[in-house]
Amino acid sequence: MTHFNKGPSYGLSAEVKNKIASKYDQQAEEDLRNWIEEVTGMGIGTNFQLGLKDGIILCELINKLQPGSVKKVNESSLNWPQLENIGNFIKAIQAYGMKPHDIFEANDLFENGNMTQVQTTLVALAGLAKTKGFHTTIDIGVKYAEKQTRRFDEGKLKAGQSVIGLQMGTNKCASQAGMTAYGTRRHLYDPKMQTDKPFDQTTISLQMGTNKGASQAGMSAPGTRRDIYDQKLTLQPVDNSTISLQMGTNKVASQKGMSVYGLGRQVYDPKYCAAPTEPVIHNGSQGTGTNGSEISDSDYQAEYPDEYHGEYPDEYPREYQYGDDQGIDY
């Protein structure tokens, strides 16, 4: 008789095998043993894996659940007929309705490779049998929920298209009640001040936000002159139009001494050029004008000598006596 000899596992293979074996449930094995023996009427024995290895009990089990599932059951002691029985059982439970991911492989049972998966398959098979109405005294497996198929006519289907379910979200019964129109004035009040309640819905509580009593008081109109003062000099501002130096300063700049736009100004170096004979314009340091743009007498150097201030001789008489017969010949 041919046997499949498998050596011991080492390293990672041994670690994986031990991890799979640790998930094996001894209580589930005992429940499965009782359930299979009750359904088939055949004894498994003390060793669960050896009792199911030949596949005879498994084929008898599926034939009890679904008669005629396995046509021929091999009772030979050879390995290949036993593997054939296991293969026929796997095909039969697939046709019975088992999911592919719940079914073990033939080597998991025959070579004792993964008895945890074999146990999972048999528990799922017991639950499927319970779902289909096959009941026993052994309560094992989970009964699957039955499919509830409902049919609706066209009228109900069209009516349901206009209904918004709560699965799409809810607005918690929100409405526009109390909302004011655009541009409507709304007052502010603070509930903590124990003031009267708002008269209408146009009043906003400070819990909704506040502008801290901001207003346009003291704000000057565009173009209004605003003075500058220094707080360090303990000078009191005249009015709200005064700007503190903390806001910046232009260092008391003014237009004093600035010439009129378009007025010619000559540039010369006294080291290399003679004194100018035309008026010299300073940048506001001199001058007698009210706005600093006029030229003083000291800024002007005449190019002519001093005028004569003496008396002129009276060489000619100032008055001439002319007679009636006298005249002037030209």
Swiss-Prot record:
CDD domains: CH_CNN3 (cd21284). Keywords: Acetylation, Actin-binding, Calmodulin-binding, Methylation, Repeat. GO terms for cellular component: actin cytoskeleton; actin filament; dendrite; dendritic spine; glutamatergic synapse; microtubule; neuronal cell body; postsynapse. The keyword Magnesium does not apply. Calponin-like repeats lie at residues 164-189, 204-229, 243-268. Residues 279-330 are annotated as: Disordered. Pfam families: Calponin, CH. One of its GO terms (biological process) is actomyosin structure organization. The modification N6-methyllysine is found at residue 158. Residues 306-318 have a biased composition (Basic and acidic residues). GO terms for molecular function: actin filament binding; calmodulin binding; microtubule binding; protein-macromolecule adaptor activity. Residues 26-130 form the Calponin-homology (CH) domain. It comes from the Eukaryota. SUPFAM superfamilies: Calponin-homology domain, CH-domain. The modification N6-acetyllysine is found at residue 23. PANTHER family: CALPONIN, MUSCLE-SPECIFIC PROTEIN 20. Belongs to the calponin family. Thin filament-associated protein that is implicated in the regulation and modulation of smooth muscle contraction. It is capable of binding to actin, calmodulin and tropomyosin. The interaction of calponin with actin inhibits the actomyosin Mg-ATPase activity. This is Calponin-3. It comes from Rattus norvegicus (Rat).
